[in-house]
Amino acid sequence: LAIGFIIHIIWASVLTLQNQKARPVKYALRNQSQNATWASRNMYILGAMVLIFLVIHLYNFWWNIKFPSLGTPLSAITVGGVEMEDTYTLVSSLFESSIVYCLIYILGAVLVGLHITHGFWSAFQTIGFSNDIWRKRLECLAYFFAIVFAVGFSIIPLYFIAGLGN
């Protein structure tokens, strides 16, 4: 997965540089037409913001779970006779301690959703589904998938903001 992200970032950087070299002089008036969504026009910046969110997310969760001696040590709980790390306490302590972190996490989920929206249908366009019939269907599917993703990941901090964590 990590290698896939690295390749994705490198390829996105190469494509962005190629696009900039193809048109070294910027347009005098930027066309805000329906041919290009906000996400597609700002994909590289959106990707950078998603990367920042991903680093924050991995540091706060993955790092603390995989390397508890270097971060916040996790307590152990027993579920069904199996001892495991108490990751619920880690998640709840982060979201209950700061409304700012909750808002950053919700914003991050929305940014990932926007990034996915363009990337989803664009990937299918790359492999040949670029006619008018398929493009509209894939755009709808991309929006649906992005909304499910953003709402799904936003539910966790919203759950704690609403005070339902205890």
Regions found by a protein language model. Name each.
Residues 1-166:
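Membrane-embedded alpha-helical bundles that constitute the cytochrome b-like, heme-associated redox core
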